[in-house]
Amino acid sequence: MDKERILTPAVVFSVALLHLAMVALLWQAHKLPVIESGNVIEFVDLGDFGGGDGAPEGAGAPAAPEPQPVPEPPKPVEPPKPVLKPVVTKKADADIQQPKEEPKPEEKPKPEEKPKPEPKPEAKPVPKPAEKPVEKPSEKPAEHPGNASAKADSEQGNGEDKGTGTKGDGTGRGEGSGKGSGGVKGEHGEGAGSSKGNPLRANGSIPRPAYPTLSMENDEQGTVVLSVLVSPGGHVESVKIVKSSGFSRLDNAARKAAQNGHFQANAWTEFKVPVKFELN
């Protein structure tokens, strides 16, 4: 047992030495060789140490230029690779050829229909107010002087002369009555008596009054009786409402029409004019 214990450390030590020797050999074998650079020869000037050339003493020769690095050789330029173009192969035409579809014609947009204008409502005709003929006005003419025989003849020769008056839309016609040199009365007409001299005549008419729009919308109807005072020569001096229709718009329309009336009178004459407003 003791021998075995002594041999064991000796064996371990010897093995370790062998390993170290092998490692040293391998290290020497793989050691890289050192490339020695070329010898540089330096020239030393053995001239006068006093610097005879004017250079300061102790100045040596200029240092040799450092060796320039050797440029690396240029890398070879690779030629460009050729670009392969795709080869298009045409397929053989099939025996059965289908007819090509013809393009469908484009549908033209239909023109837009213009909206039809709405029919305008027809304006209803304005009803025309019916007017009655002008009533017989009262006239007071001045008496004309005459001889006694003329007065007697006039008193004995009183007579009546009747005439017809026409009715029309918007206008009225009438005559006044009065005593003349012949003492003749006229009713709704013109005439002369059997006495001597000329009778006094008075007649006239008014234009058709316009029917007020608001009165038409409110169904206003009625008759207006006017008193028209006319001066000698036929000029309208004043218009008064004797009887109202009940609606101020109708009364004003009748009065305005009477102010524009046409009358014939030889003296101051007052006419009674009825104006009727009626909706059909």
Swiss-Prot record:
Q: Which residues cross the membrane?
A: 6-27
What highest taxon heads this organism's lineage? Bacteria
Domain named TonB C-terminal is located at 196-280
> Tell me, what does this protein do in biology?
Interacts with outer membrane receptor proteins that carry out high-affinity binding and energy dependent uptake into the periplasmic space of specific substrates. It could act to transduce energy from the cytoplasmic membrane to specific energy-requiring processes in the outer membrane, resulting in the release into the periplasm of ligands bound by these outer membrane proteins. Required for heme utilization and virulence.
State the oligomer form and interacting partners. Answer: The accessory proteins ExbB and ExbD seem to form a complex with TonB.
Q: Which NCBIfam families did the record assign? A: tonB_Cterm
What this protein is called in its record is Protein TonB
The protein's gene is named tonB
